[in-house]
A protein has these predicted regions:
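Cytosolic regulatory regions of ion transport systems
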Residues: 1-98
């Protein structure tokens, strides 16, 4: 069983997270919007309201221990790029970006 983090829990991210759970993996779901985290909290291993553009937050959540991270941040390309840079900085090796 692999451990994944899904950052951005809108339509795409939530679908990816639930599919990974159905495949038997552990999933940490992360979003800055409370409503998205609440919508998926019962379906994933852990759901966290957090700012994924903050490198310290990603480090505190031990995201580097995940087998892979899916970045599914919606329309905000700057936030998506910043998140990926921080993930690389903390040592995440497998990053999949929408």
């Amino acid at each position: 069983m692999a451990q994944f983090a899904v950052i951005g829990l809108g339509s795409f991210g939530a679908t990816v997270a639930t599919q990974l759970i159905e495949l038997g993996h552990d999933v940490i779901g992360i979003d800055s919007e409370k409503k998205y985290v609440e919508n998926i909290s019962e379906q994933v291993t852990h759901a966290v309201i957090a700012d994924a553009t903050d490198e310290h937050v990603l480090d505190e959540l031990n995201i580097k221990n995940c087998d892979a991270v899916v970045v599914a941040i919606g329309e905000n390309i700057e936030a998506s790029i910043l998140c990926v840079l921080h993930l690389k900085n903390i040592g995440v090796e497998k990053i999949w970006v929408k």
